[in-house]
């Protein structure tokens, strides 16, 4: 039996155990749901100089980030068709970012969504049908379902992702 068939069987078993027939979708935060640049833009000149090249380590940066264009509406649409989780990585050297990410999810995606937040540096350990991520780092490139590479020519924005995932021809 091919590895992909085994993975699909495992995913179905997990879905049955959870009593859902909806496909599982994981959605990254930074530069997918969250506009990371908006956080950088909110920093003081001192903070920009102090944390240049490692802005994710700046305390409080995640609390100031805005949603990516179309991200909130896309999440709402996908949530109707899929079993959605937020799968993100938080920097080890900025423990406050873990809390800020949780608060961001609650603020923009609703009170119940924070219970669907998973913070991990090993995204490949999560079983699901799709991972929407802008990078291949932290296990995204080894994800056993389909990696929807956000921000690429094929999936440049949320409209293209939602269109692809909700198409009848899938």
Swiss-Prot record:
Species name: Vibrio phage KVP40 (isolate Vibrio parahaemolyticus/Japan/Matsuzaki/1991)
GO biological process, one term: pyrimidine deoxyribonucleotide catabolic process
Binding positions (Mg(2+)): 28, 30, 134
Coiled coil: none
Lineage of origin: Viruses, Duplodnaviria, Heunggongvirae, Uroviricota, Caudoviricetes
GO molecular function: 5'-nucleotidase activity; metal ion binding
Active site per database record: 28, 30
Disulfide-linked positions: none
Its EC number(s): 3.1.3.-
Cofactor: Mg(2+)
Family: Belongs to the 5'(3')-deoxyribonucleotidase family.
UniProt keyword list: Hydrolase, Magnesium, Metal-binding
Function: Dephosphorylates the 5' and 2'(3')-phosphates of deoxyribonucleotides.
Gene3D superfamilies: HAD superfamily/HAD-like
Name of the protein in question: Putative 5'(3')-deoxyribonucleotidase
PANTHER family: 5'(3')-DEOXYRIBONUCLEOTIDASE
């Amino acid at each position: 039996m091919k590895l992909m068939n085994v993975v699909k069987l495992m995913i179905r078993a997990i879905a049955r155990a959870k009593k859902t027939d909806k496909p599982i979708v994981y959605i990254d935060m930074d530069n997918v749901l969250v506009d990371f640049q908006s956080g950088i833009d909110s920093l003081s000149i001192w903070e920009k100089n102090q944390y240049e090249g490692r802005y994710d380590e700046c305390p409080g940066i995640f609390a100031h980030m805005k949603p990516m264009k179309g991200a909130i509406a896309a999440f709402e649409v996908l949530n109707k068709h899929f079993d959605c989780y937020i799968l993100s990585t938080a920097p080890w050297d900025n423990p406050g970012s873990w809390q800020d990410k949780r608060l961001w999810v609650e603020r923009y995606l609703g009170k119940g969504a924070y219970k669907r937040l998973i913070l991990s540096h090993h995204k490949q350990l999560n079983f699901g049908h799709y991972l929407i991520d802008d990078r291949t780092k932290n296990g995204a490139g080894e994800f056993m379902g389909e990696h929807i590479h956000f921000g690429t020519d094929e999936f440049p924005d949320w409209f293209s992702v939602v269109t692809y995932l909700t198409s009848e021809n899938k």
